Curated annotation (Swiss-Prot):
Positions bearing the site annotation: Essential for channel activity, possibly by being protonated during channel activation, and by forming the channel gate and the selective filter: 40
InterPro entries: Flu_M2
Intracellular or extracellular location(s): Virion membrane; Host apical cell membrane
Domain observations: Cytoplasmic tail plays an important role in virion assembly and morphogenesis.
GO biological-process terms attached to the record: protein complex oligomerization; symbiont genome entry into host cell via pore formation in plasma membrane; symbiont-mediated suppression of host autophagy
Species of the source: Influenza A virus (strain A/Chicken/Hong Kong/FY150/2001 H5N1 genotype D)
Name recorded for this polypeptide: Matrix protein 2
Single GO term (MF): monoatomic ion channel activity
Length: 100
């Protein structure tokens, strides 16, 4: 039997056979798993959108960064520039390295 014959004789399932058998189910396990799945998806999307803010908050707590009390202003500015450059590098996920 050739491949063409097999394709021609294959019978597609009717629409009723394709439908999900658990749609409209009031089974508590199905409802709970659906809610957990939706919450997981929402949290994952929020994590991807705001991961820098979230993890920076976890790292430094509610403060904006490490304490600069008693540190001269010039050193504070240098530290801010270092932190900003580290964040800027993270934006692209790639770092260009030039070999001389």
């Amino acid at each position: 039997m050739s491949l063409l014959t097999e394709v021609e004789t294959y019978v597609l399932p009717t629409r009723n056979e394709w439908e999900c058998r658990c749609s409209g189910s009031s089974d508590p396990l199905v409802v709970a798993s659906s809610i957990i799945g939706i919450l997981h998806l929402i949290l994952w999307i929020l994590d991807r959108l705001f991961f820098k803010c979230i993890y920076r908050r976890l790292k430094y707590g509610l403060k904006r960064g490490p304490s600069t009390e008693g540190v001269p202003e010039s050193m504070r500015e240098e530290y801010r520039q270092e932190q900003q450059s580290a964040v800027d590098v993270d934006d692209g996920h790639f770092v260009n390295i030039e070999l001389e």
